[in-house]
């Protein structure tokens, strides 16, 4: 049986601690139970109210709403489908309250990309922080473009997996 050299894991543990600390320092109001008032999320809540009320009354999922555009399917405003196993995986990607969890995922994802490309750990930490703390990320978080933030957060991880599987392609 091989022994784990914990000393070699230390830089990566330090990186994760740095990412968590910076995310929660930036988003410290979430530790007090506060949330960002995101305009798109407020609009979504208004659009989904009829669907949510129907589910509370009947216990069934509604796939149509009359409250938007004289009627439309609820697929874009949060219809839930049986057998959607990816939603469970998706929900486990985020540790703690949002937006801190979005930032942590963004930091870790870009950190892994830089490591996969052969960049040393210290520069990978700096690069991950620069990528995660860019102004655009905060703009889209403020207005409620959460799915766009998740796409930005996960893309470096996808690229790192492509690079690992086929190093000559990236």
Language model: regions and residue ranges:
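Transmembrane-helix signature of membrane-embedded glycosylation machinery that interfaces
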Residues: 110-119, 159-162
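Residue-level detector of conserved catalytic or cofactor/ligand-binding positions
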Residues: 160-170
């Amino acid at each position: 049986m091989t022994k784990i050299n914990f000393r070699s894991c230390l830089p990566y543990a330090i990186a994760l601690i740095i990412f968590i600390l910076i995310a929660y320092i930036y988003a410290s109001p979430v530790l007090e139970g506060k949330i960002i008032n995101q305009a798109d999320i407020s609009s979504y809540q208004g659009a989904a109210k009829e669907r949510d009320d129907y589910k509370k009354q009947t216990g069934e999922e509604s796939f149509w709403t009359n409250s938007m555009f004289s009627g439309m399917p609820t697929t874009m405003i949060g219809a839930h489908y049986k057998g959607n196993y990816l939603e469970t995986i998706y929900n486990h990607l985020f540790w703690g309250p949002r937006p801190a969890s979005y930032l942590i995922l963004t930091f870790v994802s870009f950190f892994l990309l830089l490591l996969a490309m052969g960049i040393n750990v210290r520069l990978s930490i700096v690069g991950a922080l620069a990528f995660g703390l860019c102004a655009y990320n905060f703009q889209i978080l403020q207005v409620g473009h959460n799915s766009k933030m998740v796409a930005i957060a996960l893309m470096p991880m996808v690229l790192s997996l492509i690079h690992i599987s086929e190093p000559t392609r990236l």
